[in-house]
Amino acid sequence: MHTAALKQNLLRNLSNLPGWRTRRHIVVIESDDWGSIRMASHESFRRLRDAGLPVERSHYNRFDGLESDDDLAFLMETLAEFRDSTGRPPVITGVNVVANPDFDRIREEGFAAYRYEPYTRTLQRYPAHAHVEALWHEAADRRLIVPAFHGREHLNAARWMRALRGGNRSTLLAFECGVTGIPRRGIGGEEVPNFQAAFDLDTTADLADQQEVLRSGLALFEQLHGRRARYFVPTNGYFNGSL
């Protein structure tokens, strides 16, 4: 292992020293990106692939999409089949985003400003997602899947808007397909910025936008889930200490 990697690993372990400890043997099951669009549809996948974007090389682009009624119902059914020594089922921490880009409104306004919509509105555009919101509430009430905060959306909105306004071909095509998370090497080898890291910085001016993302995202989380977020995992791990 390189020196830099060793140092990073050591610092990560040291940062955990002040945290909570127990002698119990606990298995933590954490699953993230709930509520987020990754690949909007099979048609979007084919269109991007046929245009030369190597989406087929990314397991996220191949398999990740907005959770459906069946996804949650089958997962809850599976979890409920198991019990620990006290009779309790396993609990998954479902790390959620609560919004997605409002592609239609952004397009209508000529990319003048970023707009977002609650993920519950995104669900309305999908054919088998009518009960997702209710299933989340049921899962939390039954202590099967408990929501945690991942960010407002799984998107660095300021960086994404700069790429759209700058005419990045791959980003513009993905926009037309309702997709934001695409490979870093785009059409014809075009460089594509990392849009998934919502709290990464290009300039210090982005901090003000990110503060608003946190404020509005946490408020929306509480509104949608009926509880305040107690746990936060930044998308892709990037997070500035001044936030």
Regions found by a protein language model. Give the residues of each.
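Catalytic alpha-helical scaffold of carbohydrate-active enzymes acting on polysaccharides/glycoconjugates
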Residues: 2-231, 237-243
